[in-house]
Each structure stands twice: as structure tokens, then as C-alpha cells.
Amino acid sequence: MLKLIRQSLPKPLKKVLSNIKKRTYDNWKKKLFFKRMQLKHIALLKKLKDKDKIKVVFLVLHKSVWKVDPLFKKMLEDPQFEPLILVCPYTSISLEGTRQDMMDVYKYFNEKGYPVISAYTAKGRRWRELSELGTDIVFFTNPYKLTKSLYYEEAYKNYLCCYVPYYFMATTHTGELSSQLNTLMLNSMWRIYWPHQYVFEQFSRHSVANGKNSKLTGYPATEVFLQSGHLKEQTKKAWKTQKSKKRKIIYAPHHTIENNDSSLSTFLQYGNFIRQLSNEYQDRVQWSFKPHPILKEKLCAHPDWGDKRTNEYYQYWRENPNTQLDLGGYDDLFNESDALIHDCSSFIVEYSFTKKPALYLLNPKNRSESFLNEFGKKIFENYKKAECKKDIVSFVDDIFNEKESQLSNKNSFFESYLDELYIKSTPSQKIIDDIKSEITH
């Protein structure tokens, strides 16, 4: 009967009732859940007081959104921690795609020499339980339900869980903050480490946790771009060897190819054009195609693209002498590059750390810059933007002619942001210090 009544209600009334439910009943449930989790966390912390080593399990679905590398390295060097990467299934794709993804992610971390295991044990033909790993603390690298419940709800309901955002949170494309920042998952976290003041304050405002479970630390993923002396010794060659010296440009398209107001991607407008440019400038410029990890599956499902056309496009970048396909980490790729052309969210801020020129491809629906939040707008003030193909060609020509000084994205707000959160202490060190202070308190 209730189902029939709901179906017969007018859409405007349904929306009003849904909003009332969110503000009352749903919020009441979240508050109760948050209080229960606080008590759970207190009990779990007590169990850690006398432990010599803390087992920290990092749940990873995609290698390209691994934004805690400096933190993981610090834990490896610290005798108080035993960090481990657990490769979890990305369940939004086919079984074969999931299997291949997990193999790729495992290989990526194994080649880095990191302790890593697969969530699936072939010998036992089952999915591993977190309890059998001796887990004390869990780090989430993604806030969404994209994997099995074992590595999502069952994890955040039963362990001391931490979260570092998988992107810099400078845009609004993922939805209203009132709903994005008030999920059960975020409210259940023992600790959330936010990259900047704006989102830290917004979480305090919108979540039933009122920000009590969060800290402002800065973004661990970008520490590497501020350690230039160290990088000169450590950096491996991320780019293909060329017969002659060429400028290095990254093309990084976002996955939101849907034709709606929240879309950032301009791939359908410029993807083929930039491929043509890579061919026209082959004697002068080498290119990296650095797509969002979800772009390929969306292109395969697109009526104008499909599997064959998508695979051919990716193959072009992988196989040509002056082009390459990069699907994993990008620290070295960024550091060795000369410029970035993109329409991504997080890269707006992340690439700013390199102090190199970047061109943002504006989606026709977002030319008012309404896709940026207050933090993003301040970072974006001096950004170079492209509204047409001519703007892209002009930027590439300037990079080839080494006119970087004319393309500077220098920003006083960004410099102040660096001074506040990165100079005295790094984000990863703040996170380590915070965890230690809590487990020894």
C-alpha cells in the first residue's frame, strides 16, 4: 500500500518529502550511528595502548588515485607501524575487468617494493577478511561503495578507519556538499585528514559529526613536488627516450563525458583534436595521455565510441614513438614534464605545486566557473583557460617556444596556502603525529 501511495505522489511533493526525511529521520539515524562509532573507537583505541606494532591496512582499488604514498613510506620507516596494501575489487565493471584491474594494481605496488596482497586468495578461492590480517587501523582511499561490503561497510563499522580524499576537493562536480559530506561512511571515520581549510570547515558545518573526527593537514600526495633536491636523486625516467630534445606535455582528460551540468570533461570535444596535435608536433613535442581511470569504461559504453574505437585510441598513445599512455602514479611524470593540458578536478591544485604552466579545458557548460568551490576559485584565478581549439594550439606553441614566463599561474593565495600547511611540517608527518598521539594518549 505504501509503495502505491509513493508512486502516486507528484514529483515536486516527492522531492519536498524526501528533503524533509533527509533533514529529520535520516540525520537522526546518522547522529545515533556517529555516537555509537565514537564509543566503538574508544574501545578499539584501548586495545592498541599496549601494542608494540600497529597494523595499518590501506584499501586500494585504483593505482591512479593512490594519494598517500609519502604517508605509507613514513610508516614503513617507523618501527611503531606495520603498513600493508590490500588490493580490493572494483566491482562496477565486468568480472574479467575486475580481475585485470586487481592484477595491475598488485603489480604496480609490488614493483615499488611495498608490502601488498590481493583481497582475493586464489588458494582458498575466497575474499580475505580484514580480521585475518591482524588489522588495527584501516585507511580508505575512496569514499564510495565501489567494492565488496567486506572492504566498505564492514570495514568502517568495525575498525579505526581513516580517510584521505582521493582528489583535492576544489570543485563541486560531485554534488551538493550538504549530502557529499554527510554520508554514513564519512561520519563513521575515526579520522579524516582534509587538504584545505574550506572543505574542513564545510565538513564541520554539514556533517552530523560536526567535524569532530577530522583534522586539517594539507594533502600528502603533493609533498613530493616540494622536495626538488631529493627528487633529483630519486626520480626515475617517466618519459620515453627520444632521439632529439622535445618538450613534454601531459594531456589528462576527466571521465565525466555525460552531457549534464556537473560534467567537467571535454574529451568528446577535444580528444581527437589533441591526438592530431600529437602527430603534427611529433618532431617537437612528446606527449603523455593520462586519462582518469574510469574514462575508458565510459567511452566503451558510449554510442559514438564503443570498445573498438576506444581501444584503438588508447593504443595510439601507447605505441607511437612520441606518445605514451600513463595509467598509474604520476609524481615523476609531473616532475619531468613541461606543461599540462587537462579538465580534471584535483590536478587544478596538484599541478600547481610544480610551478609549471597548465591549460584548463573549459567545458561549455562550465565557462562561468560555477564548477569550482571557494578554494578552487582562488587557485583558478590566474589559470590559463581554453574555450576553443585555437587556445590549445596557442598554448602548445608557447610551450614549444619556451615562453613559460608568459604562462605563469603564480598565485599569492596558493603561496599562502603552502606556507600554512607544508613548510613547517608535511601533511604525512602531521598524520603520523596525530595517530601516535591518539594511540598513546
What do the PLM-derived regions correspond to, one by one?
Residues 1-52:
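Membrane-proximal basic amphipathic "stem/tether" segments
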Residues 121, 302-349:
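Donor nucleotide-activated moiety binding/catalytic core segment of transferases
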Residues 57-226:
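Active-site and donor-binding regions of nucleotide-sugar-utilizing enzymes
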Residues 116-122, 322-327, 381-395:
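Short acidic-hydrophobic, aromatic-tinged amphipathic segments that line or gate anion-handling sites
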Residues 29-43, 165, 181-263:
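A nucleotide-sugar donor-handling region in carbohydrate enzymes
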Residues 46-57, 80-81, 157-159, 243-247:
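A short, charged/proline- and glycine-enriched loop
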Residues 67-71, 76-77, 220-310, 388, ...:
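Conserved catalytic-core segment of nucleotide-activated headgroup transferases in glycan assembly
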Residues 210, 305, 346-419:
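Catalytic binding pocket for nucleotide-activated donors in carbohydrate/polymer assembly enzymes
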